[in-house]
Amino acid sequence: MIGKWNRLFCCGVALLVLSGEGTMAAAESIEQKVEACAGCHGQDGKPVDKSIPVIWGQQTGYLYIQLRDFKRGDRKNEIMQPIAATFEKDDMLAIAEYFSHKPWPDLGQPRSPKDIAERALTAEHSVGCTGCHLDRFQGDGTVPRLAGQGRDYLAQTMIDFRTRARGNNPGMSDLMIAAPEDDLAALAQYLAGL
């Protein structure tokens, strides 16, 4: 129930941002443009709902690509698509740069128990996550940090890639299809606890 109210709040923030004087395009400074982001992604970088990703401290190139993909319609989300539609390329680059320089928040997620960690590492080895996300899952450039990301967001994102509901990275879909779904749940829990 809390998640539903948080999502409704985020929708309200998005509508406010997109209405009249509050449009993102009309904002004069980067601080004004990113202020609305806090409604969902959190004032302190901790999202208001577990289904919303951490963007503070995320890779600049990755953030830019996601905003671009929301704007193009290559990545679907009823809240983010209308917001991103108001941005020009320079806005998206500035927003990505702004959030990438914020400190990554500690979500207080527990480390995985040994059995979950072992299952997650088996899945990681079969999928090859570290080939792109690097050894400590910190990401680089256009590849996102996964370590410490919200468990629910990670799990849903993996499922969305697996079912091709998220279609802005076909290579990720192929990798997620190759892994057993239970292993992906363990992987999400493991990554969240790093």
Q: Where does each model-flagged region fall?
A:
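Inter-heme linker and motif-flanking segments adjacent to c-type heme-binding CXXCH motifs
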Residues: 46-47, 101-112, 116, 136-145, ...
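Short glycine/proline-enriched turn or capping motifs at secondary-structure junctions
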Residues: 5, 165-173, 177-186
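Cleavable N-terminal signal peptides
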Residues: 12-15, 23-25
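Sequence/structural segment immediately N-terminal to covalent heme-attachment motifs in c-type
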Residues: 25-46, 107, 111-135, 150
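Conserved hydrophobic/aromatic "anchor" residues
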Residues: 70, 98-99, 124, 161, ...
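Bacterial N-terminal signal peptides that target proteins for export
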Residues: 1-11, 20
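Gly/Gly-Pro-rich "capping" loops immediately C-terminal to redox-active cysteine motifs
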Residues: 30, 45-76, 81-86, 130, ...
